[in-house]
């Protein structure tokens, strides 16, 4: 019974260790699937709108942008519960608060863009900051998006230090020239990174992001401990972006190896541990009372052979 409990404890410990290591990767993949499902519904609802309905969305967004005198942003990650107006939340609202989609091919990122609200804060979602321009596909826009780097798990997994989605974690690896794509309804807006910097929360608040005449800017902000990573980009023509994306596709090596390592290594270690446990179990076979082991049977066979080969020796022993 003790041997059985030992094996059971080893199996449970192995499962716990494997789960600890692969939980973030599995959770991230499930999060990506949820985001893909959200965007699939978004595209369906976009396709269901006629041309007039789509144009009206952009006109509403442009009216919002015209009402902005200056583009600044508070630190939306520490500002507590942020309430936004119903008027803001109704603009560009195609599906359940989703404005569009952020795509960064260089880091394999694709995320829905939500309206900033109490239900969708910047600490949990990639959001549009309501003090900036909405993506109206026009000139003089300065769009600000904000979201977490790594989404902390909720409940007990979060208390254990486990994470859920890897959202804007890889923004650090971007360089000037990296392309960023915004898909809003049936329109595509492409931006090229011009600068990446790390700021304090106070420094971020002091930044004046108001666009100049004819400028079209995109800013993405993500927290890094007590600092704020800020990526700034300028809009470029879609035709130019297609050429650059084609060049990136030819030069980019697949980055799925990260997931292979995160999933493959724990599985391989688990397999080795299971094989070790099986060998231990095979070496300690449980037998019923009176049941002979294989080793005992082999010993008896060897003794019988020796008896047949030396019968005189046995008789001498018996006479003594």
Name each region found by the language model:
Residues 3-263, 279-291:
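Solvent-exposed, non-transmembrane regions of membrane-associated and secreted proteins
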Residues 285-320:
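Cytoplasmic C-terminal tails of single-pass
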Residues 266-267:
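Contiguous transmembrane helix-bundle modules in multi-pass membrane proteins
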């Amino acid at each position: 019974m003790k041997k059985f409990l030992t094996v059971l404890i080893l199996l449970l410990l192995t499962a716990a260790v494997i789960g600890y290591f692969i939980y973030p990767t599995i959770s991230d993949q499930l999060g990506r699937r949820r985001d893909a499902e959200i965007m699939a519904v978004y595209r369906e609802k976009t396709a269901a709108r006629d041309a007039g309905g789509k144009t009206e969305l952009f006109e509403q967004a442009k009216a919002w942008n015209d009402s902005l005198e200056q583009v600044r942003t508070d630190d939306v990650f520490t500002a507590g519960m942020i309430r936004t107006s119903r008027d803001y939340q109704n603009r560009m609202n195609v599906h359940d608060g989703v404005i569009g989609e952020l795509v960064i091919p260089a880091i394999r990122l694709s995320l829905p863009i939500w309206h900033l609200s109490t239900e969708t804060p910047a600490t949990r979602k990639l959001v549009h900051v309501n003090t900036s321009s909405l993506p109206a596909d026009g000139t003089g826009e300065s769009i600000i998006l904000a979201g977490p780097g790594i989404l902390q798990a909720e409940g007990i997994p979060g208390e254990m230090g486990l994470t859920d989605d890897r959202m804007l974690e890889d923004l650090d690896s971007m360089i000037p020239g990296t392309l960023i794509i915004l898909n809003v309804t049936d329109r595509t807006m492409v931006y090229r990174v011009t600068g990446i910097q790390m700021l304090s929360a106070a420094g971020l608040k002091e930044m004046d992001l108001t666009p100049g005449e004819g400028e079209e800017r995109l800013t993405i902000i993500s927290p890094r401990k007590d600092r704020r990573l800020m990526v700034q980009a300028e809009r470029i023509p879609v035709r130019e972006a297609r050429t650059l994306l084609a060049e990136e596709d030819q030069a980019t090596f697949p980055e799925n190896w990260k997931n292979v390592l995160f999933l493959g290594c724990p599985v391989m270690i688990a397999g080795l541990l299971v094989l070790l446990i099986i060998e231990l179990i095979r070496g300690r076979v449980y037998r019923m009372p009176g049941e002979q082991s294989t080793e005992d049977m082999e010993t008896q066979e060897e003794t019988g052979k020796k008896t047949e080969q030396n019968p005189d020796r046995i008789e001498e022993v018996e006479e003594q």
